[in-house]
Regions:
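Structural detector for hydrophobic anchor residues on beta-strands
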Residues: 3, 15, 25-27
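Short aromatic-glycine-(Arg/Gly/Cys) micro-motifs in beta-strand/loop hairpins
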Residues: 7-22
Length: 127
């Protein structure tokens, strides 16, 4: 869903990003190109651990009238809510046997199952 992000920039600082549809949810970005990814991450952290239903996006005019929008730039960010589906599903993958063994050893050393280890690795690489 597309939401409004209010972006502010002061000289010598990162871009400040406020997401008014998510009260108290904010982020920062070094470049305007980073706003989308950082807004996504902020919403995921905002929703973590709670029963969360994505809000309906406020109209552009309503966001533009907010006090926090003054002297800011309004941008549309596309927030993906697939992270809310935490069902565990079986997956069949192919890899060299030695890599399966290395992953198994590393997972055991970390106190994880192979599946949990691979999920953590995927998250660490930005999935």
């Amino acid at each position: 869903m597309k939401y409004i992000a209010i972006v502010h920039k002061n000289e010598g600082t990162a871009y400040g990003v406020t997401l008014p549809d998510f009260p108290g949810c904010f982020s920062a970005a070094d470049t305007l190109d980073d706003v989308q990814a950082n807004a996504q991450e902020a919403v995921e952290l905002y929703a973590h651990g709670e029963a969360f239903t994505p809000p309906e996006p406020m109209p552009f005019e309503q966001a533009a009238a907010l006090e926090e929008a003054q002297d800011g730039v309004l941008m549309l960010v596309d927030i993906c809510f697939d992270f809310l589906d935490e069902r565990v599903v079986p997956v069949n993958i192919s890899m060299p046997a030695y890599m399966r063994d290395r992953i198994g050893k590393a997972a055991k050393a970390a106190g994880l199952t192979r599946s949990a280890y691979l999920v953590q690795a995927a998250r660490a690489y930005g999935a």
